[in-house]
Regions:
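Hydrophobic residues in beta-strands and at strand termini
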Residues: 2-4, 31-32, 48, 103, ...
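Hydrophobic residues embedded in beta-strands of well-ordered beta-sheets
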Residues: 28, 66-69, 125-127
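Short, hydrophobic/aromatic beta-strand segments
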Residues: 1-2, 56, 109-112
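Short structured motifs
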Residues: 27-32, 80-85, 111-114
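A surface-exposed beta-strand-loop module
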Residues: 4-65
Length: 168
């Protein structure tokens, strides 16, 4: 079930090809042609827009801290579908996610996974985060504000892992 009362699905793509779909109430039904075999792993991109609502512990917050804008999510336990089209069931996990956040260039965007890119386009920046482990929809999160980013590393056995800390 997709609880997207405040979100409008613009289009759905698979392998960069548009797919037909219906979006009625909280259900997004995608037509695959040819049909997928049960158990097949595949990927689709859902493009959407809107003004998210906020439920639970504050699933989508647009606020300020010390006079500076901040947007953040806290989706536990069922608030994820307030701000992104997902199957909001605690036991269901996506095998991976890519998050693209378009935000004012004066700010930084943090999310799950590893930062892939920050592409500045005038007054806006597109930040791409990639997470490649199974994840429940309520654990997907992002935040945007005037972060200061500290880049460090941590030794895990013989592997030197990068570690980024976002502070404000």
């Amino acid at each position: 079930d997709l609880v997207t009362g405040f979100l409008i699905v613009d289009s759905v793509k698979r392998n960069n090809q548009l797919l037909t779909f219906t979006h009625i109430d909280s259900a997004l039904n995608i037509n695959f042609s040819p049909s997928l075999t049960v158990g097949t792993l595949d990927s689709v991109s859902v493009y959407y827009q809107g003004s998210p609502s906020s439920t639970g512990f504050g699933s989508f917050i647009d606020d300020t801290h010390a006079g500076t804008p901040v947007i953040w999510t806290l989706s536990e336990p069922y608030g994820s579908a307030d701000w992104w089209p997902c199957k909001s069931q605690l036991g269901d996990k996506a095998d991976s996610i890519d998050i693209y956040i378009i935000h004012p260039s004066a700010y930084k965007a943090a999310s799950n996974g590893i930062l892939q890119s920050e592409i500045v386009n005038g007054s806006q920046t597109t930040t791409h985060w990639k997470h490649r482990y199974p994840i429940a929809s309520y654990l997907v999160a992002f935040a945007v504000t005037n972060y200061v980013v500290f880049n460090n590393s941590v030794m895990l056995g013989s592997v030197n892992l990068p570690m980024q800390t976002y502070c404000y």
